[in-house]
């Protein structure tokens, strides 16, 4: 019975099923051939039909089941009736079998803030770089990201017709992260992943100071954190404003649950309470291992230019 499970684990189990449905919606929009692209603030800040439908699906599905939640989504959508086909009311039973970490067992619905990025890597989505795309649902308590779900709609899309398309990664602090194979980047190598479409001199200066062996430029914050946990990159460095709370909330949980660290460029933890400003104005610095190496190499000039 649902009542025997904690609010947090019921929410995570529901968000998992909702994220899977979101992945299906993302694939359907591509298959139909009309992305419905709208330019928001610039040529690199885009919104598609998938962004709109997925946000409606996630936010409405969560709000129906958990009416006291605070839900903050990336897209500014007009209120209105949501098509019943977009509603997902299932929950992933495997998650309900897991124990809730004791520090979260008494959390109430109204204590939680959910940060939603319906399509992280929208620009890449419009350009056919489908492996960059993720759906992000992050859950915060007392300003801290404590649970997260990442759906990769096109995971395996280049692995041949017999490969299962898409996957969902999830994690809860104090419990762990699941749905992927943890792998560390090669020891002694500094492989840095950073922005593909929002670079500037600060970003370049910060990365150069870290003596990188390789620099990967890819889309999506969720995608970059997946690179860290799967050993494709050693650090994620973005010394610039631009990234928002819905970009980092879910990925941060997955990284922290396996022993990594994500902060702003100054080393401060990011805050996720409902009143906080949405922009991560002091950038992002993350690593699975050896975080201190990267933090110690951030130039003072870069820190001085980025005010938290």
From Swiss-Prot:
<feature type="modified residue" description="Phosphoserine">
    <location>
        <position position="240"/>
    </location>
</feature>
<comment type="similarity">
    <text>Belongs to the inositol monophosphatase superfamily.</text>
</comment>
<feature type="active site" description="Proton acceptor">
    <location>
        <position position="122"/>
    </location>
</feature>
<dbReference type="Pfam" id="PF00459">
    <property type="entry name" value="Inositol_P"/>
</dbReference>
<feature type="binding site">
    <location>
        <position position="74"/>
    </location>
    <ligand>
        <name>Mg(2+) 1</name>
    </ligand>
</feature>
<dbReference type="InterPro" id="IPR020583">
    <property type="entry name" value="Inositol_monoP_metal-BS"/>
</dbReference>
<keyword id="KW-0378">Hydrolase</keyword>
<keyword id="KW-0597">Phosphoprotein</keyword>
<feature type="binding site">
    <location>
        <position position="117"/>
    </location>
    <ligand>
        <name>Mg(2+) 1</name>
    </ligand>
</feature>
<feature type="modified residue" description="N6-succinyllysine">
    <location>
        <position position="244"/>
    </location>
</feature>
<dbReference type="GO" id="GO:0046854">
    <property type="term" value="P:phosphatidylinositol phosphate biosynthetic process"/>
</dbReference>
<feature type="modified residue" description="N-acetylalanine">
    <location>
        <position position="2"/>
    </location>
</feature>
<dbReference type="GO" id="GO:0004441">
    <property type="term" value="F:inositol-1,4-bisphosphate 1-phosphatase activity"/>
</dbReference>
<keyword id="KW-0452">Lithium</keyword>
<dbReference type="GO" id="GO:0046872">
    <property type="term" value="F:metal ion binding"/>
</dbReference>
<feature type="binding site">
    <location>
        <position position="220"/>
    </location>
    <ligand>
        <name>AMP</name>
    </ligand>
</feature>
<dbReference type="GO" id="GO:0008441">
    <property type="term" value="F:3'(2'),5'-bisphosphate nucleotidase activity"/>
</dbReference>
<keyword id="KW-0479">Metal-binding</keyword>
<feature type="binding site">
    <location>
        <position position="247"/>
    </location>
    <ligand>
        <name>Mg(2+) 2</name>
    </ligand>
</feature>
<dbReference type="InterPro" id="IPR020550">
    <property type="entry name" value="Inositol_monophosphatase_CS"/>
</dbReference>
<feature type="binding site">
    <location>
        <position position="198"/>
    </location>
    <ligand>
        <name>AMP</name>
    </ligand>
</feature>
<dbReference type="InterPro" id="IPR050725">
    <property type="entry name" value="CysQ/Inositol_MonoPase"/>
</dbReference>
<feature type="binding site">
    <location>
        <position position="195"/>
    </location>
    <ligand>
        <name>AMP</name>
    </ligand>
</feature>
<feature type="binding site">
    <location>
        <position position="119"/>
    </location>
    <ligand>
        <name>Mg(2+) 1</name>
    </ligand>
</feature>
<protein>
    <recommendedName>
        <fullName>3'(2'),5'-bisphosphate nucleotidase 1</fullName>
        <ecNumber>3.1.3.7</ecNumber>
        <ecNumber>3.1.3.57</ecNumber>
    </recommendedName>
</protein>
<comment type="function">
    <text>Phosphatase that converts 3'(2')-phosphoadenosine 5'-phosphate (PAP) to AMP and adenosine 3'-phosphate 5'-phosphosulfate (PAPS) to adenosine 5'-phosphosulfate (APS). Is also able to hydrolyze inositol 1,4-bisphosphate (Ins(1,4)P2) and inositol 1,3,4-trisphosphate (Ins(1,3,4)P3), and is not active on Ins(1)P, Ins(4)P, Ins(3,4)P2, Ins(1,4,5)P3, Ins(1,3,4,5)P4, Ins(1,3,4,5,6)P5 or InsP6. Probably prevents the toxic accumulation of PAP, a compound which inhibits a variety of proteins, including PAPS-utilizing enzymes such as sulfotransferases, and RNA processing enzymes.</text>
</comment>
<keyword id="KW-0007">Acetylation</keyword>
<feature type="active site" description="Proton acceptor">
    <location>
        <position position="51"/>
    </location>
</feature>
<feature type="binding site">
    <location>
        <position position="224"/>
    </location>
    <ligand>
        <name>AMP</name>
    </ligand>
</feature>
<keyword id="KW-0460">Magnesium</keyword>
<feature type="binding site">
    <location>
        <position position="117"/>
    </location>
    <ligand>
        <name>Mg(2+) 2</name>
    </ligand>
</feature>
<feature type="binding site">
    <location>
        <position position="120"/>
    </location>
    <ligand>
        <name>Mg(2+) 2</name>
    </ligand>
</feature>
<feature type="binding site">
    <location>
        <position position="74"/>
    </location>
    <ligand>
        <name>Mg(2+) 3</name>
    </ligand>
</feature>
<feature type="modified residue" description="Phosphothreonine">
    <location>
        <position position="122"/>
    </location>
</feature>
<dbReference type="InterPro" id="IPR000760">
    <property type="entry name" value="Inositol_monophosphatase-like"/>
</dbReference>
């Amino acid at each position: 019975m649902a009542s025997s499970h904690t609010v947090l684990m019921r929410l995570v189990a529901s968000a998992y099923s909702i994220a899977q449905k979101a992945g299906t919606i993302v694939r359907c929009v591509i298959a139909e051939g009309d992305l419905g692209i709208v330019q928001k603030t610039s040529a690199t800040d885009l919104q598609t039909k998938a962004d709109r439908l997925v946000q409606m699906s996630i936010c409405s599905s969560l709000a129906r089941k958990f009416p006291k939640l605070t839900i903050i989504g990336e897209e500014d959508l007009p209120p209105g009736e949501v098509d019943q086909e977009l509603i997902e009311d299932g929950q992933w039973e495997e998650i309900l079998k897991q124990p809730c970490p004791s520090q979260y067992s008494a959390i109430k619905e109204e204590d939680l803030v959910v940060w939603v990025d319906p399509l992280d890597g929208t620009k890449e989505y419009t350009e056919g770089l489908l492996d960059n795309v993720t759906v992000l649902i992050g859950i915060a308590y007392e300003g801290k990201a404590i649970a997260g779900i990442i759906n990769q709609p096109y995971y395996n899309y280049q692995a041949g017709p017999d490969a299962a398309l898409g996957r969902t990664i999830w994690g809860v602090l104090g419990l762990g992260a699941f749905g992927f194979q943890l792998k560390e980047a090669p020891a002694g190598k500094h492989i840095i992943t950073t922005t593909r479409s929002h670079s500037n001199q600060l970003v370049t200066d910060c990365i150069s100071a870290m003596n990188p062996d390789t620099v990967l430029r890819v889309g999506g914050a969720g995608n970059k954190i997946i690179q860290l946990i799967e050993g494709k990159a050693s650090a994620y460095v973005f010394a610039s404003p631009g990234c928002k709370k819905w970009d980092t909330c879910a990925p941060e949980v997955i990284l922290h649950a396996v022993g990594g660290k994500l902060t702003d460029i100054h080393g401060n933890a990011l805050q996720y309470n409902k009143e906080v400003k949405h922009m991560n104005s002091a950038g992002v610095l993350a690593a699975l291992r050896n975080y201190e190496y990267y933090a110690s190499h951030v130039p003072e000039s870069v820190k001085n230019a980025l005010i938290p």
